[in-house]
Design a protein with these regions (language model features):
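Conserved, well-structured functional cores that handle cations and Mg-NTP chemistry
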Residues: 1-29, 36
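An anionic, glycine-rich sequence signature occurring as long contiguous blocks
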Residues: 39, 45-141
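Non-catalytic, well-ordered alpha-helical scaffold segments
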Residues: 118, 132, 146, 169-176
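A short, flexible helix-boundary coil/loop motif
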Residues: 74, 80-83, 153-223
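A short acidic (Asp/Glu
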Residues: 27-31, 52-54
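Generic secondary-structure signature for well-ordered alpha-helical cores
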Residues: 9, 60, 64, 183-187, ...
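Short amphipathic alpha-helical "interface-anchor" segments enriched in bulky aromatics
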Residues: 128-163
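Short, conserved catalytic/metal-binding motifs centered on acidic residues
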Residues: 17-23, 40, 120, 144-149, ...
Length: 223
């Protein structure tokens, strides 16, 4: 929480929602972020909690809504305004996504049906975020790990130790994170769809590198 406290103090409008694992499903953490009007969406997997028990008790009696997420067929349950967690300073919403999809096995080329069951607790109201968006936010926590950190290692050499000294290693990582965020903000917010068409992120990264080298080294781009 110390890191979040520093971030909120320095950049109070940088974010509105925190995504977290079930480890952070605690009343002090919820209340800490509710105070500066931030929202949370946290994995709910502790079957001993009253919040989980109350939601689970309604799964068999309330029909789910059908939805999709990519190639997956989903059944969604959405229970807003639950008061099963009085230690939290507001009502909590529980969202469940039961997902089914098929995978073709490489060995025998047969299709195998896969399922996954996700439950989240969130402070976002139904008016603020639809069920589909809440499910999408819940899965984005894994996207950060599977895509962002994966890309940082494979494309940005973030796992390479340029100088084996703690402060230097921290600085290199922070600069890598900053460069990664700036580049992806440029890709997502500045480039128009027409400019992206037929190109890749690597193409634009190469152009940016060429521009930076051209400015740093006089005559770099000269014929």
């Amino acid at each position: 929480m110390r890191l979040l406290e520093r971030v909120i103090h320095a950049y109070p409008r940088a974010f509105d929602l925190v995504l977290a694992d079930g480890l952070y499903l605690t009343a002090p953490f919820f209340n800490f972020l509710l105070a500066p009007r931030k929202h949370l969406l946290v994995v709910l997997k502790d079957e001993r909690r009253n919040l989980y028990k109350d939601a689970a008790g309604m799964f068999d009696f309330i029909a789910p809504q059908q939805g999709t997420r990519g190639s997956r067929d989903c059944l969604w349950w959405d229970f807003p305004d639950l008061l099963s967690w009085p230690q939290v300073n507001r009502a909590v919403r529980v969202v469940r996504s039961l997902e089914t999809w098929s995978v073709r096995r490489q060995l025998d080329k047969r299709e195998s049906i896969q399922t996954s069951d996700w439950i989240w607790a969130t402070t976002l109201s139904a008016a603020q975020t639809s069920t589909a968006w809440a499910v999408g936010f819940g899965h984005q926590r894994w996207d950060i790990e599977n895509h962002a950190f994966n890309e940082l290692v494979s494309q940005w050499q973030a796992d390479h130790v340029f100088k084996p000294e703690p402060n230097a290693m921290e600085c290199f990582l922070l600069v890598a994170f900053l460069a990664y965020n700036i580049f992806h903000a440029f890709w997502a917010l500045s480039l128009k769809p027409q400019a992206k068409r037929g190109t890749t992120q690597s193409f634009w990264a190469t152009l940016i590198c060429a521009e930076l080298h051209g400015r740093a080294i006089p005559g770099f781009l000269s014929p």
